[in-house]
């Protein structure tokens, strides 16, 4: 349990370090040490849990309630980030969807937080697939962060050269970009270890906003346009995800993946009601995975440093 908390929270340390570091050498040190620790702990988690079979992890009710409140606050902050950028760049559709998601997030929090202790007793879950995904996130993700240290130096040098030819200067936003990459890792660990759908939704939305900010990294008209294509399509998925959660809650169904699986095999009248939330969650997955007909944002995302 402690290791799962560590994997989720520790990437925030190098993320903060990237924002505070001054100079390439300091950023390299933060990135290499942070990535090395994440990979090492990931391997330890895999060794400890891979042969033990599926496990649910209990969290103290008070702690669980506080973490649910924090996840709701994060959801609202993410909506605020989207709305700020939508207003800044005058994108009407993103503004409308951002308002819808903000209202939905606040309504869902008001519905569920009073009963959060009941629905988040065992919010974390590991099975074989979870462990494989933890390895993928921790090892592959960390290696990407390490590679980005050198890649972003070349990217910035090229950016500065092109700007100089135009008689301009190129701002250095590498600290923010590298911080977003480690924040992305933290959110991915939340996604692959959460049984609680509220927590999973929070991690889901963090990755959505991180992708938006990274796609728009250069602030060129093309980058901004493609970033908004991504955020609009992913917000459609986020709203579908949120609608699915609200449907589950209103109909008295569990807000956990394991609870939904258990209910699906119960053969009760309530089991039939699972069709709608499963469809909504699947729609969210299609947008996130850029599957047809939501695939159009993925090509545009290549304008990001990649």
What are these language model-derived features?
Residues 1-10, 62-75, 128-138, 198-210, ...:
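Structural signature of hydrophobic alpha-helical transmembrane segments
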Residues 6-24, 79-83, 286, 290:
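N-terminal signal-anchor/start-transfer transmembrane helix
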Residues 8-12, 31-42, 75, 98-106, ...:
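Alpha-helical transmembrane segments
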Residues 20-29, 84-97, 220-222:
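Membrane-helix interface "capping/anchor" motifs
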Residues 26-37, 91-105, 173-182, 227-237, ...:
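Cytoplasmic-side transmembrane-helix entry/capping segments in multi-pass membrane proteins
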Residues 50-63, 110-129, 153-169, 199, ...:
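Juxtamembrane/interfacial segments at transmembrane-helix boundaries in multi-pass membrane proteins
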Residues 59-188:
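Hydrophobic alpha-helical transmembrane segments in multi-pass integral membrane proteins
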Residues 176-269:
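Alpha-helical multi-pass transmembrane bundles of energy-transducing inner-membrane proteins
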């Amino acid at each position: 349990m402690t290791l799962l908390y560590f994997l989720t929270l520790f990437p925030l340390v190098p993320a903060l370090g990237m924002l505070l570091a001054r100079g390439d050498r300091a950023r390299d040190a933060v990135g290499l040490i942070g990535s090395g620790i994440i990979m090492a702990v990931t391997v330890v988690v895999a060794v400890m849990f891979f042969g033990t079979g599926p496990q649910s992890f209990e969290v103290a009710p008070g702690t669980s309630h506080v973490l649910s409140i924090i996840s709701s606050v994060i959801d609202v902050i993410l909506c605020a980030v989207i709305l700020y950028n939508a207003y800044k760049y005058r994108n009407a559709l993103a503004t409308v969807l951002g308002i819808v998601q903000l209202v939905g997030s606040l309504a869902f929090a008001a519905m569920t937080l009073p009963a959060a202790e009941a629905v988040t007793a065992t919010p974390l879950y590991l099975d074989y697939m979870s462990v494989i995904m933890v390895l993928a996130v921790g090892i592959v993700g960390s290696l990407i962060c390490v590679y980005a240290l050198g890649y972003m130096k070349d990217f910035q040098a090229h950016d500065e050269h092109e700007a100089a030819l135009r008689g301009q200067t190129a701002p250095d936003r590498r600290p923010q970009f590298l911080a977003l990459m480690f924040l992305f890792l933290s959110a991915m660990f939340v996604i692959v270890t959460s049984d609680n759908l509220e927590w999973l939704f929070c991690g889901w939305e963090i990755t959505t906003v991180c992708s938006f900010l990274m796609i728009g990294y250069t602030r060129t008209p093309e980058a901004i346009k493609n970033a908004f294509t991504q955020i609009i399509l992913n917000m459609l998925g986020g709203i579908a995800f949120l609608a699915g959660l609200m449907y589950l809650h209103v109909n008295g169904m569990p807000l956990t993946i394991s609870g939904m699986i258990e209910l699906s095999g119960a053969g009760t009248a309530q089991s039939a009601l699972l069709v709608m939330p499963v469809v909504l969650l699947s729609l969210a997955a299609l947008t996130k995975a850029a599957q047809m007909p939501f695939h159009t944002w993925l090509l545009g995302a290549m304008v990001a440093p990649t």
